Amino acid sequence: MGPVRHILNERKSRKIAAFLLINTAYMFVEFTSGFMSDSLGLISDACHMLFDCAALAIGLYASYIARLPANGLYNYGRGRFEVLSGYVNAVFLVLVGALIVLESFERILEPREISTSSLLTVSIGGLVVNVIGLVFFHEEHHHAHGEAHSCNGGLQSSENHNKSRNRHHIDHNMEGIFLHVLADTMGSVGVVISTLLIKYKGWLIADPICSVFISIMIVSSVLPLLRNSAEILLQRVPRSLEKDIKEALDDVMKIKGVIGVHNFHVWNLTNTDIVGTFHLHITTEADKSSIREKASDIFHEAGIQDLTIQIECVKR
């Protein structure tokens, strides 16, 4: 299936594409008005919209790439493209937020005259666009869950997911988009407030203060994405499974005939796919098939979808 057909056939992709077009069009309006009126608040809000557009485009592309089948070069598929893109996007957002804060402090020390003739109209228009985005993605944020997909392992790959505990995974792609739009909405509210204060009170300092507020919204909304994507790329044990994995290891050690567990590795392949491998040392007289099945059931219940177990008989 080509990318265009994928967008047309998938409800979530259609929503992303539609809002991407709306957001991109109004971003240019905000940039133009911001530079003409010399409003840092409006320019910073437009910068955030620029990265929102990048996030939307990445999410749209990732939703297509993630569907491509695994091949000889990408044995696990390309699901990690979304994770890598999210990390890069998060780093740039933090940098933009820091630059806006620095510029804001300069303007607090040396306030500049700002033209408010068209600023209020543009600010309210930006708020309307972001409210449309919230309506678009609120349902997905509230209800969407990712489906866990298993990958074929090496020595023994367990694929019976019906035995696993009923776990739901948030669709991190849609969640991230919703949080971006929510932060943008709060930023638009700040721009409208600062414009009103400048127009009717003459408080020029309201513009840089609003910009600092927007920057805080940008950074605070992106830090969880930055941390989570970095942990996935560094193959950290999933935070949500730490306790369950420890209990699973204890349960496996209680199986009759098991001597020890070695070379144990668990990591997030993508936001939803969890992979585990380990060597299981058992006694020579133990039943390999029975022990493998019991160990597989235990780790499936702990949330590991793709499990590879190597059985090693050890003389005692």
UniProtKB/Swiss-Prot annotation:
Q: List residues traversing the bilayer.
A: 16-36, 46-66, 81-101, 117-137, 177-197, 203-223
Q: Name one GO biological process term.
A: intracellular zinc ion homeostasis
Q: Name one GO cellular component term.
A: Golgi apparatus
Topology in the lipid bilayer:
Multi-pass membrane protein
Q: Which residues form a coiled coil?
A: none
Intracellular or extracellular location(s):
Vacuole membrane
Q: Where is the signal peptide?
A: none
Q: Where is this region: Disordered?
A: 147-166
Q: Which GO terms describe its molecular function?
A: metal ion transmembrane transporter activity; zinc ion transmembrane transporter activity
For this protein, the record's PANTHER family field holds:
PTHR45755, ZINC TRANSPORTER 7 (PTHR45755:SF4)
Q: What is this protein called?
A: Metal tolerance protein 8
Source organism = Oryza sativa subsp. japonica
The opening ranks of the lineage are: Eukaryota, Viridiplantae, Streptophyta, Embryophyta, Tracheophyta
Q: Which gene encodes it?
A: MTP8
